[in-house]
Amino acid sequence: MKNNYINTCVVYLMATFLLISLISIKKCTADLSAHPLCPDNLKDYCIHGECHFLEDVQEPACLCETGYRGKRCHELSMD
């Protein structure tokens, strides 16, 4: 399965000698396979993927099958 769970990371680069602040948004992937599988009441949360439970935030997250993306692996991917 392709790991499509994406976190947004903000990176700040300061060029103080020019008094310019550059802010860029980058996509960061998380290794969901390190998290436990979702409990039975959430086993169908991911439409086309595998549900993992993020214990630190108490939320489910999906590892999408190839060809799918989105929070619940519900969107076809053209990648």
Swiss-Prot record:
Alphabetized GO MF terms: epidermal growth factor receptor binding; growth factor activity; toxin activity
Paired cysteines (S-S): 38-51, 46-62, 64-73
Reported tissue expression: Expressed by the venom gland.
Transmembrane segments: none
Position of the signal peptide: 1-30
Record localization: Secreted
Keyword presence, Chloroplast: no
Record's keyword terms, sorted: Disulfide bond, EGF-like domain, Neurotoxin, Secreted, Signal, Toxin
PANTHER family per record: EGF-LIKE DOMAIN-CONTAINING PROTEIN, TRANSFORMING GROWTH FACTOR ALPHA
Family: Belongs to the EGF domain peptide family.
Protein name (record): OMEGA-myrmeciitoxin(02)-Mc1a
